[in-house]
A protein has these predicted regions:
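ATP/Mg2+ or Mg2+-diphosphate-binding catalytic cores
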Residues: 4-5, 119-125, 201-213, 230-231
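Active-site beta-strand termini and strand-to-loop segments that position acidic
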Residues: 1-3, 165
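ATP-binding pocket architecture of kinase catalytic cores
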Residues: 5-100
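An alpha-helical support segment within catalytic cores of ATP-dependent transferases
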Residues: 32-35, 80-81, 85, 92-155, ...
């Protein structure tokens, strides 16, 4: 039997973000979560409730553990390969009826918003010889048309967000950034999470090799890194 989880989310608002906008974002997450459930890639939501100050999300719990379990962290090479294989599996899914088909446009809109208020973090471009936020923004302006909407994404492809049972894929969680967009967003986060959660960048090349170098565009990968400066 599937376990049910209740999440209480306290919402803070500012002049540029209304409660209606946040509700819409949560409703979109429900839609894409239901879509992932239909494709047997996750379990989705049961219910979303809201009042004037807080939101409640009822979720089904996928049985298993994420990649942060000792069983997986203690075997980083296998973890790396498995992470890449599960990403390739996701990216090969048909996406014609996905409720979010314009992820790249949404992604760039968020970048523009954060850039306009100087919300930035250069840690995301340590591998790309970008030294200032101005350089990052200029690269985005010159290359942003490279981003495509041709792949079903998780959008936050990190070790805590994939559930396994003894190395067997069980499902994805936390799908608020999912949709049809550019695969290099997931590739960027896959490499990032290996470095962040394992504590070394030595598995970066192995991850890309296991995914398939023939499907990786280094310019688009750098573009995503620059976008995440303002993510």
């Amino acid at each position: 039997m599937n376990e049910i989880l209740c999440y209480r989310i306290f919402l803070g608002y500012n002049d540029s973000q209304t409660k209606e906008q946040l509700v819409t974002e949560n409703e979109l997450e429900q839609l894409v979560s239901a879509y992932f459930q239909k494709k047997k890639l996750g379990l989705g939501y049961i219910s979303y409730l809201s009042d004037q100050s807080q939101d409640f999300l009822l979720k089904k719990k996928i049985q298993g553990e994420n990649y942060l379990a000792k069983q997986y962290l203690n075997n980083p090479k296998r973890l790396c390969d498995n992470l890449a294989e599960n990403l390739r599996f996701l990216h090969e899914q048909n996406f014609e009826d996905c409720p979010i088909l314009d992820h790249s446009e949404r992604y760039l809109k968020k970048v523009e918003k954060n850039a306009s208020i100087n919300n930035s973090n250069l840690d995301f471009v340590n591998n790309y010889n970008i030294r200032t936020t101005e350089e990052a923004y200029d690269y985005i302006e010159n290359k942003k048309l490279l981003l495509r909407n041709d792949t079903l994404l998780h959008g936050d492809y990190c070790l805590p967000n994939i559930i396994l049972d003894n190395w067997k894929f069980k499902g994805f969680i936390d799908l608020d950034c999912a949709g049809v967009g550019d695969r290099h967003i997931d590739l960027f986060w896959g490499a990032w999470t290996l470095n962040f959660n394992i504590g070394t960048d030595q598995y970066r090349d192995r991850f890309f090799d296991a995914y398939g170098r023939d499907r990786i565009d280094v310019d688009r990968l750098k573009l995503v890194g620059c976008c995440e400066v303002f993510g």
